[in-house]
Regions:
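Solvent-exposed loop/turn segments at secondary-structure junctions
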Residues: 1-2, 44-47, 68, 75, ...
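Extended, well-ordered alpha-helical scaffold segments
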Residues: 19-28, 84-95
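Active-site Gly/Thr loop motif
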Residues: 35-53, 96-146
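Structured C-terminal helix/loop/strand segments within mature extracytoplasmic catalytic/sensor domains
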Residues: 127-207
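Stable alpha-helical elements in mature extracytoplasmic
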Residues: 20, 24, 64-68, 91, ...
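Active-site helix/loop module of the DD-peptidase/beta-lactamase fold
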Residues: 13-58
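Extracytoplasmic, non-cytosolic globular domains
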Residues: 7, 58-61
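Alpha-helical scaffold elements that line and support the substrate/ligand-binding pocket
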Residues: 1-28, 68-75, 142
């Protein structure tokens, strides 16, 4: 990520945004409705290296759950936000697919293309930060899930891998719950054909 940040910053020499923080703010975060105070990166600092304004994009980020969810929603829709293509579809597909390197890596994202998590659909991908902060995106389920909190504990005998507790405590239970909800859906009523709702009101079904 550090090398990628350097390359992107070098490519911005003649652009309106001179650093990656400004680029992300103007091209992504503001267009998807994330307030400036809801996110930060690189500990809020900028360093000059080789005459370039470098932001430490590989760490020091702070994002609210809502901000992360909006980014996940943007990626779910392959870079499209309310009809406007902010990122090219090809770029989104490339960075969220298996890059062919160890550890289920995409480019800045993690991919389930290899089936690392057997209970997750193969099109699932996720971003993660320190302390098991995670955003999971599953296009085939139209799913975006965000997890913020403390570091998750590994189970006894569990492989010493960063994503194992996330897989066991978040990914698998979440997908099992969704699949179970679909499987256990109640049949349609023979007596009620429709229930009219006022404009703007949505129905939330309890399938328990």
């Amino acid at each position: 990520i550090a090398m990628l940040t350097y390359c992107v910053t070098a490519a911005l020499r003649d652009a309106p945004q001179k650093d990656i923080r400004s680029l992300l703010r103007d091209r992504i975060m503001r267009p998807i409705g994330v307030p400036d105070e809801d996110w930060s990166m690189g500990y809020g600092k900028t360093y000059t290296v080789d005459g370039l304004p470098l932001v430490g994009a590989w760490g020091g980020g702070g994002y609210t759950a809502r901000a992360v969810a909006r980014v996940g929603q943007l990626m779910l829709h392959e870079g499209n936000w309310e009809g406007k293509q902010l990122l090219s579809k090809d770029a989104v597909r490339q960075v969220t697919s298996d890059a062919g390197t160890p550890g289920n890596c995409g480019i800045g994202w993690w991919s389930n293309n290899s089936g690392y998590c057997a209970k997750l659909p193969r099109d699932a991908f996720w971003g993660s930060g320190a302390g098991h902060q995670v955003v999971l995106v599953v296009p085939s389920l139209s799913l975006v899930a965000v997890r913020n909190g403390e570091m998750l504990e590994a189970a006894p005998g569990e492989p010493d891998l960063y994503h194992e507790p996330v897989r066991r405590l978040l990914f698998e239970p979440l997908v099992e719950t969704i699949s179970g909800s679909v499987t256990n859906a109640k049949p349609a009523s023979a007596d009620v054909e429709a229930v009219p709702l006022p404009p703007g009101v949505k129905a939330v079904w309890d399938l328990s």
